[in-house]
Amino acid sequence: MATQDADIIIIGAGITGCALGAALGRQGRKVLVLERDMSEPDRIVGELLQPGGIEALEKIGIADAVEGIDGQWTSGYQIFYGDSNVSVPYPSKPNGGAYQGIGFHYGRFVMNLRKALTSTPNVTVTEATVNELLRDETGEVITGVVTSSKKSESPVEYKAPLTIVCDGCFSKFRKAFIDHPIQVTDHFLGLILTNPDYIAPGRGHVILSKVAPMVLYPISSTEARILINYPGKNLPPMETLKKYVLESCVPNMPEKLRPSLKAAVYNDRLRSMPNQFLPPTVNRTKGMILVGDSNNMRHPLTGGGMTVCFHDAYLLSRFISPSAVPDLLDYERILNQMNKFHWKRKGYSFVINVLSIALYKLFTPKNRYMKALESGCIDYFKRGGNCVEGPIRLLGGLDHSPSHLIGHFYAVCLYGIYQYVLSGPALLMPVRIIESLLIFLQASLVIIPYILSEMSS
């Protein structure tokens, strides 16, 4: 076995790995990035970047990765609920103009990130599969990795004081270091619509149909991605899924969008992705850090995953910078920094993680009390002002305040209760007042377990 050295080994040249590698290389660290497959990836998620994620890219210095890929700037969302719809625009910037998100093909974006990575000083990128983590004689310290590749007949060892695992949502190294079980809540079915007839051009479309929530956003000048919720942990055969889209989803979406979705079922490949939730874990292993989706995942309904990953990359690079950790063999110092990093990241990760699951629960109501909350949420947005700007700042990754999230959530709850009590005949008002307690309880059961999960992890 041959040995090659670096200051830091990064496993995975995806969203987090590329951003982190670029940030560390610019600090003067000698970085080796190992990626199993350097060809353009093809996924149905990770195609919408919120304004907060763009801000994180700017801090790292690689914001130009969104350019030259036919990405489409978005100004917010249009939410469709029954026969009505409500506009949820991104807020204005302090110095003028408005914040924007951007939609793109995931693979094109990753290839741009890899270009930024490979052009960064002090960074080496190697195509190889990491099969094993090396440990020292005590078994307590990770000292490097063992890889295989098409270019080498025998395994190759790479050693470094610090190994950072960024191998994504299907991480093969996670299980040995994280005790939390991964929750699979449901699935997204993905299709690409060609030249759809947008109702609100330049905005993401959130369709709260009777069947399931659907999210649609542009990913090129001629294409839009639609993600359709399919409940349950297991999927039926593909023909059943196509029938579900054609017979249940198409009739329950805005009429202008129906032809393009119907055509996509016949012309595009219907793909699926499990929606997973994993609370974060403090890194306590000497010589190794888990970061990105390998450590923390949230529901993709709100499109906040990449925003969390880019903020993680930026923040982690600061916590292990040469000024913060001069000696990468000083494991106690690194572990202390990891504890600080874990709690510092709570601002943005708490908000995006909890909001993702809260909105998913609200927009897939299982009973009439949850339906009242869903309706209350839409009516809350319709009030305008801070009732719409506050939530979109949270969703867009621009507001990192957990208290603001909890405040808006319970404001939605109380407004939904208010609407519910007044919507029935006067004779039933006493009954509805009693039922309002059940609505409040349902709302609390939605959000409190995830708040506790975030704060205890």
Curated annotation (Swiss-Prot):
Catalytic reaction annotation: squalene + reduced [NADPH--hemoprotein reductase] + O2 = (S)-2,3-epoxysqualene + oxidized [NADPH--hemoprotein reductase] + H2O + H(+)
Cofactor(s) listed in the protein's UniProt record: FAD
Induction text: Expression is anaerobically up-regulated via the sterol regulatory element binding protein sre1. Expression is reduced in cells deleted for the translation-related genes tif302, rpl2501, and rpl31, rps2402, rps2801, rps1002, rps1601, rps1802, rps1901, and rpl1602; or the transcription-related genes spt7, spt20 and elp2.
EC number: 1.14.14.17
Membrane-topology annotation of the record: Multi-pass membrane protein
Keyword field: Endoplasmic reticulum, FAD, Flavoprotein, Membrane, Microsome, Oxidoreductase, Transmembrane, Transmembrane helix, Vacuole
Transmembrane segments: 347-364, 409-429, 433-453
Protein localization: Microsome membrane; Endoplasmic reticulum membrane; Vacuole membrane
Observed effect of gene inactivation: Leads to the accumulation of squalene.
Miscellaneous comment text of the record: In Aspergillus, the biosynthesis pathway of the sterol precursors leading to the prevalent sterol ergosterol differs from yeast. The ringsystem of lanosterol in S.cerevisiae is firstly demethylised in three enzymatic steps leading to the intermediate zymosterol and secondly a methyl group is added to zymosterol by the sterol 24-C-methyltransferase to form fecosterol. In Aspergillus, lanosterol is firstly transmethylated by the sterol 24-C-methyltransferase leading to the intermediate eburicol and secondly demethylated in three steps to form fecosterol.
Similarity-based family: Belongs to the squalene monooxygenase family.
Protein's UniProt name: Squalene epoxidase erg1
